[in-house]
Design a protein with these regions (language model features):
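Generic detector of short, well-ordered, non-transmembrane alpha-helical segments enriched
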Residues: 14-15, 312
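Feature detects long, helix-prone N-terminal segments enriched in hydrophobes
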Residues: 283-288, 302-306
Length: 327
């Protein structure tokens, strides 16, 4: 009789637990990996695609063997290929692997109190890309097209050496100032700690802006409005050569309306940079990764997002990624 009562109590306890879906219980629930919708494949040769898929599979294996999702489903997808018009003299193909941290959520609309579902969207993601830096106006392993409106790329922060890689900085990208503030943390893994881009000098930048302004004047006609900016450019070009060889640090929205350079660290400024084609081994097939970027994007204030992101970071091995370069 006592055994029957004990079994009944245990059954009731488990039944109660099964009916009680809470945020706290779901946070501890073992998660799962799931292949999500796969992205496009464009302008990639069959031979290169085979090699690129092998690289992505190695990245997935690295992360999935070192990290077990908890309280979420991790959806992952891939993209291979490029728009040929986005660069010129392509050296390597861009391709990438993306992870989406999808939380388990209690279904408050269901009469079944134990029911939960997988969220359909997330602000918390991980991207590991080969041969492209998306945060740098899409720097590719190629030159800038001749018809590019700008003629250079905009870098927000100086890269810094850290943990065997280049830390490209962090940036708030959503929910600014809120508990759920969304931040990106960007890393770059390269050959011999070199960079696939170089800094444009003030002189180079001034010449680019002068040409753009001259084109605008030809199309729209001269005016006092444009003439004052041309005067600013010509005045800067008369400075000492040592000043003109300094990196161009510019106000973000002050390109064709040139008023002057700013100092490093000025809010709302950028470094003008260009692809460094001498960085690359041009004898390698386009499928070879010649640099990787790793971007962690996480929404703060949610333990599932924060704990899973911390675990992912431990699984992403920068040394292993560096060892893949050129292979």
């Amino acid at each position: 009789m006592k055994q029957l009562i004990l079994v009944t109590v245990i059954f009731i306890s488990f039944s109660s637990l099964a009916q009680d879906c809470t945020k706290e219980l779901l946070q501890q629930k073992p998660g799962a990996w799931k292949a999500g919708p796969q992205g496009s494949i464009h302008d990639v040769s069959a031979a290169d695609l085979v090699k690129e898929k092998a690289v992505i599979n190695a990245i997935h294996k690295m992360v999935s063997t070192g990290y077990a999702p908890k309280g979420c489903q991790v959806s992952y997808s891939t993209v291979y290929g490029k728009n040929p018009a986005a660069g010129k003299n392509w050296i390597a193909d861009p391709y990438y692997y993306a992870m989406y941290i999808l939380r388990y959520l209690c279904d408050k609309n269901s009469t079944d109190k134990s029911k939960y579902y997988v969220d359909v969207s997330t602000p918390t993601t991980v991207n590991i890309t080969a041969n492209v830096i998306f945060s740098l106006n899409n720097l590719y392993a190629s030159g800038i097209p001749d018809d590019d409106l700008r003629g250079y790329l905009k870098l927000k922060q100086q890269p810094k050496k850290k943990d065997g890689a280049w830390f490209m900085g962090e940036e708030v990208v959503g929910d600014y100032g809120m508990v759920s503030e969304i931040k990106e943390y960007r890393w770059l893994i390269t050959y011999e700690d070199k960079l696939p881009f170089s800094f444009i000098t003030r002189k180079e930048y001034l010449i680019i802006q002068k040409r753009r302004l001259e084109q605008t004047i030809r199309e729209e006609g001269a005016s006092d409005f444009y003439n004052k900016f041309m005067s600013n450019i010509n005045g800067e070009l008369k400075r000492a050569e040592a000043d003109l060889m300094k990196p161009a640090i510019c106000p973000w929205n002050d390109e064709q309306r040139f008023t002057g350079f700013v100092e490093e660290g000025t809010p709302g400024s950028f470094y003008a940079v260009k692809p460094n084609l001498d960085y690359y081994n041009k004898q390698l097939p386009r499928s070879c990764p010649q640099f990787f970027t790793v971007v962690y994007k996480v929404s703060k204030g949610d333990p599932v997002f924060e704990e899973n992101m911390a675990a992912v970071k431990k699984a992403v091995d920068f040394a292993a990624l560096k060892n893949m370069l050129g292979k």
